[in-house]
């Protein structure tokens, strides 16, 4: 690797020219990469709810719907508004009771339950159903929602997942750049305190920032990325890959002393040492992200690929761009050096190795409640619930529930040749299910006495088209609640009893599938990440015992972090419980590998157990603390700022996890080394030097 290091030093100017030039195509590519704001679209395409969604789009030309609450408006004004909304690009149909009750079908002919579902006399409001020609996450649909918001603002409210997605887009696009600024500033503050230079932290951030842009610029290979991936990528890549920059800098400082101030030679050797050292840790981090790709819920694949790429770009930038920047700015670095403000914490090492038995007892005592809390976490799946109270969509959903007692809305897709009698009978059976507020089909609205030719063609086309007909079920229960999930199960039984080809779709059925699928995914991802990292540690250290010890200690840190919400009663967004463990495992193993490598080196040189572990800990502590504090600062700041709960919760958990992992690696891991030193030396390569005599 020394040849590579010398090559980087020799061609450092060319490297910087190419690196800065690549920012242009990367930036343009990033700008033109589509962002997907529809989390439910990542469900497997083969499940019935997603197949039904495709039928809705293909057969009815409808992919989503919204409810619009209209307050203090006269019928003629509503009719005008309905026409204006229907003219919007992306809107397919607008349905209110006036759509059905036209001159050919008087108000008296409409069932009271249908009329009452669209009208609330006490609140002086009416309800309008808007259907869209594309899915609820399409750009066209979200743009239509935004235009509707402007048209009906102040006295009207747009509810539903399409509105939630539109609000999410607005918030994320406003806040994502601020996330990066917060993470960068707080990381720089930490490095300013813990390092001896003002310029070097800036160079770290510049190098990592360029790697982030390369990463975002190559997302075109996926076609699109999720908003969650967009929001978290820069922050996580900064936090996760900062280790490599810190390691290069420390190695560079050591090599300068070794080569009497020859900085070019020192940098060449520092690059060589860094490549060797970060290979194992970066591969384990990548493995953690790759584990996310094994999820059936393909949001994991989306985040996993982007973050794995991010680590690769981070490593490449660390051994090419960063060394070139450091050498180019050498004079400025020397002029701006200052005293390190953080106290030397390496003295902790001797205390840890002297009290390892007490620390081991603490490990066991804390482990049991940590596992209990970890297994009793409360998770929520209501995507609308992640929005801040200030979001119009959340206010609209709450008003919809308050004024119309309307929670989730289900859609039944049934064969169009289902008999009128069966259609009416099925709707009657569905009405008997607990929590069903309204169930309608075109046949049930007309009843057995009203002939089809009395129904406006517009209304017919909404409910029947080609081989399928559409029926609506309004539930009193909220999406993702146990009550609505039980309701969905009962309705599915009824629907399938009348037609095996009929399907129940909508936000709530999709969310029920999401719950089932992600529960399995969580177990799969946890198992895959542990196995992959176990195997990598096994290969890197050629040890049977070390993978068990390292993974066990890191899993302990994860149990503690994820166990806290179990005791505080904090509800976590479903995706947090899946990704936190994987990211924390992949990031924390870097600290553990750094310390283990030094421990192995010390034992190989002939040092006894206690001095070897004490020195390894002393030499690693500062690096571990600086890296962990940078990770904490980057994620904690974003967690405090973001008012999107899904992003905020993940960042707060990652921040807390970084601190917990830091303490576990500094205090618990060396204690395990003290206890299992004989086993480790006997079952691992590179711990004993046969050429040394006792």
Please place each PLM-identified region on the residue numbering.
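Membrane-embedded transmembrane helical bundles of large multi-pass transporters/channels
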Residues: 1-35, 136-381, 496-694
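Structured non-transmembrane domains adjacent to transmembrane bundles in polytopic membrane proteins
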Residues: 45-162, 378-546, 552-571
């Amino acid at each position: 690797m020394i040849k590579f290091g010398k090559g980087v030093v020799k061609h450092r100017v060319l490297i910087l020219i190419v690196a800065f030039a690549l920012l242009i195509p990367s930036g343009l590519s990033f700008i033109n990469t589509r962002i997907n704001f529809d989390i439910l679209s990542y469900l497997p395409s083969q499940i019935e709810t997603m197949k039904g969604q495709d039928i809705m789009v293909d057969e009815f030309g409808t992919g989503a719907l919204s409810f619009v609450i209209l307050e203090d408006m006269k019928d003629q004004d509503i009719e005008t508004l309905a026409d204006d909304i229907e003219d919007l690009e992306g809107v397919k149909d607008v349905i209110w009771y006036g759509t059905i009750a036209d001159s050919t079908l008087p108000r008296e002919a409409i069932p009271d339950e249908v009329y009452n579902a669209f009208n609330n006399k006490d609140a002086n409001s009416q309800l309008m159903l808007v259907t869209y020609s594309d899915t609820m996450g399409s750009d066209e649909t979200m743009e239509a929602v935004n235009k509707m918001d402007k048209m009906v603002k102040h006295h009207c409210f747009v509810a539903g997942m399409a509105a939630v997605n539109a609000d999410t887009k607005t918030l994320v696009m406003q806040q994502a750049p601020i996330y990066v600024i917060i993470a960068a500033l707080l990381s720089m503050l930490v490095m300013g305190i813990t390092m001896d230079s003002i310029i070097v932290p800036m160079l770290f951030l510049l190098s990592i920032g360029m790697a982030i842009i390369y990463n975002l610029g190559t997302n075109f290979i996926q076609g699109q990325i999720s908003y969650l991936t967009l929001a978290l990528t820069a922050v996580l890549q900064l936090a996760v890959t900062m280790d490599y920059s810190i390691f290069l800098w420390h190695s560079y400082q050591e090599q300068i002393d070794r080569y009497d101030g020859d900085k070019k030679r020192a940098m060449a050797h520092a690059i060589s040492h860094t490549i060797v050292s970060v290979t194992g840790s970066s591969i384990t981090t990548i493995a953690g992200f790759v584990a996310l790709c094994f999820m059936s819920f393909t949001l994991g694949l989306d985040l996993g690929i982007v973050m794995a790429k991010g680590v690769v770009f981070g490593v490449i930038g660390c051994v090419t761009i960063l060394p070139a920047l450091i050498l180019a700015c050498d004079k400025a670095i020397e002029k701006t050096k200052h005293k390190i403000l953080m106290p030397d914490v390496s003295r902790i090492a001797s205390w840890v190795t002297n009290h390892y038995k007490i620390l081991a007892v603490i490990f066991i005592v804390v482990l049991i409640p940590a596992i209990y809390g970890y297994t009793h976490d409360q998770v929520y799946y209501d995507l609308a619930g992640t929005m801040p109270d200030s979001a119009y969509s959340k206010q609209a959903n709450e008003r919809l529930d308050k004024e119309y007692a309307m929670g989730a809305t289900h859609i039944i897709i049934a064969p169009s040749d289902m008999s009128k009698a069966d259609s009416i009978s099925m709707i009657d059976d569905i009405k008997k299910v607990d929590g069903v507020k309204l169930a309608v089909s075109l046949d049930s609205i007309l009843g057995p006495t009203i002939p089809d030719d009395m129904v406006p063609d517009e209304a017919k086309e909404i409910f029947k088209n080609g081989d399928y007909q559409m029926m609506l079920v309004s539930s009193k229960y909220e999406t993702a609640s146990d009550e609505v999930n039980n309701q969905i199960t009962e309705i599915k039984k009824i629907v399938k009893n009348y037609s095996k080809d009929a399907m129940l779709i909508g936000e709530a059925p999709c969310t029920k599938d999401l719950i089932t699928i992600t529960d399995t995914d969580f177990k799969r991802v946890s198992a895959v990440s542990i196995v992959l990292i176990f195997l990598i540690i096994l290969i890197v250290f050629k040890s049977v015992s070390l993978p068990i010890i390292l993974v066990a200690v890191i899993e302990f840190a994860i149990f503690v972090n994820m166990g806290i919400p179990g005791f505080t009663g904090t509800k976590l967004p479903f995706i947090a419980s899946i990704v936190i463990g994987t990211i924390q495992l992949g990031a924390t193993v870097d600290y553990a590998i750094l310390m283990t490598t030094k421990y192995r080196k010390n034992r190989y040189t002939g040092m006894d157990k206690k001095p070897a572990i004490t020195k390894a800990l002393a030499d690693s502590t500062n690096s571990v603390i600086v890296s962990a504090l940078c990770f904490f600062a980057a994620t904690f700041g974003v967690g405090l700022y973001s008012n999107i709960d899904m992003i905020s919760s993940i960042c707060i958990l990652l921040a807390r996890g970084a601190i917990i992992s830091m303490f576990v690696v500094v205090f618990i891991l060396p204690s395990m080394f003290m206890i299992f030193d004989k086993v480790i030396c006997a079952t691992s390569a590179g711990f004993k030097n046969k050429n040394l005599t006792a």
